[in-house]
């Protein structure tokens, strides 16, 4: 970690993911001009319609520029495993890490031959069990709980996938787990935050150092998480029509190959790079997963007390392999 004295914050200088190393350098110099042949890959706006970010491919040799208006400019040389960051004044450390640990790592993994999935995962009974889903579906919370109840932490938020000899492997992710402060407290993850974690800020998550399971694991299941509203909320909404107790049970339903393929596409961690080579590799991998790996919808109560039942349901489901 490197301390930026002007901002009094700690920033990572090395990220390790999927057995690869990404070196990070921070600079105060003005970013160099974009090469003339740069290709704009993505442009996003915030909720107010203002420009939020832009991604460019600056060469065909694994060079990218990510410009985030609330963080800074990140020039990635994926082939050489290094990124140069020019940060904005008074930038939030959380904003910097969101870019580094999310889109920067996703581009880096793509150039290293991995397909990044927006998922968290554990190693359970020697196999990779992954959890995808919309923001707020509970991916990180579930992995945090499972990691303290018999499973081994594999990754949080970004799962590097690679196919080898017909087998899909889930590789270790970044050695960090990030939780919303209320979730961290309820799950008992307290007193272990990394230095520089600012859970008091609304935008910041509590960050916990975790050592991922060291070896890639064969992907046994990919669960699409869907939280059922808490009992109190359901009681209010179901008063007039009567509540169904079965609605609050853990439910696992396997998707057909077409549904699974579409769900995987929605869960990609990078939909910006659309070169023919990348799209061909992605489509082939997701089609193979949809045919050979069970992709299931997992519905469970939005209640931390239900997590033991979730683990039991997963263990029973894995016995069907």
Spans of features found by a protein language model:
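Short charge-dense sequence patches
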Residues: 45-60, 90-96, 224, 237, ...
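Glycine-rich, often acidic-flanked micro-motifs
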Residues: 2-21, 120, 124-134, 148-321
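Short, surface-exposed beta-strand/loop "edge" segments at domain boundaries and coil↔beta transitions
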Residues: 31-32, 70-76, 91-95, 177-179, ...
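Extreme N-terminal, non-catalytic leader segments
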Residues: 67-128
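Post-Walker A alpha-helix
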Residues: 142-143
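Long, basic/Gly/Ser/Thr-rich N-terminal segments
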Residues: 1-91, 312-321
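A short, compositionally biased micro-patch
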Residues: 69, 78, 146, 154-156
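Conserved glycine(s) of the Walker
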Residues: 137-138
């Amino acid at each position: 970690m490197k301390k930026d004295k002007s901002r009094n914050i700690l920033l990572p200088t090395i990220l390790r993911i999927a057995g690869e190393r990404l070196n990070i350098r921070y600079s105060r110099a003005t970013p160099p001009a974009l090469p003339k042949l740069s290709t704009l890959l993505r442009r996003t706006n915030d909720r107010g319609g203002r420009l939020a970010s832009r991604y460019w491919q600056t060469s065909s040799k694994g060079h990218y520029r990510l410009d985030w208006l609330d963080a800074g400019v990140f020039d990635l040389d994926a082939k050489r495993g290094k990124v140069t960051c020019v940060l904005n004044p008074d930038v939030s450390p959380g904003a910097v890490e969101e870019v580094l640990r999310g889109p920067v790592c996703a581009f880096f993994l793509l150039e290293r031959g991995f397909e990044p999935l927006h998922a968290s995962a554990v190693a359970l009974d020697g196999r990779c069990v992954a959890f995808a889903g919309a923001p707020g579906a509970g991916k990180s919370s579930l992995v945090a709980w499972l990691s303290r109840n018999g499973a081994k932490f594999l990754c949080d938020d970004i799962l590097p996938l690679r196919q080898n000899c017909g087998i899909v492997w889930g590789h270790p992710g970044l050695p960090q787990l990030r939780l919303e402060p209320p979730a961290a407290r309820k799950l008992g993850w307290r007193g272990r935050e990394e230095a520089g974690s600012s859970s008091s800020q609304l935008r910041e998550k509590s960050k916990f150092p975790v050592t991922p399971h060291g070896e890639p694991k064969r992907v046994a299941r990919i669960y699409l998480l869907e939280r059922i509203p808490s009992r109190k909320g359901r009681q209010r909404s179901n008063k007039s029509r009567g509540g169904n107790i079965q609605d609050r049970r853990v439910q696992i339903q396997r998707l057909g190959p077409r549904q699974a393929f579409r769900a995987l596409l929605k869960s990609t961690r990078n939909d910006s790079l659309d070169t023919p080579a990348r799209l061909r590799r992605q489509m082939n991998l997701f089609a193979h997963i949809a045919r050979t790996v069970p992709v299931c919808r997992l519905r469970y109560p939005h209640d931390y007390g239900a997590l033991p039942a979730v683990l039991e349901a997963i263990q029973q489901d894995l016995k069907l392999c």
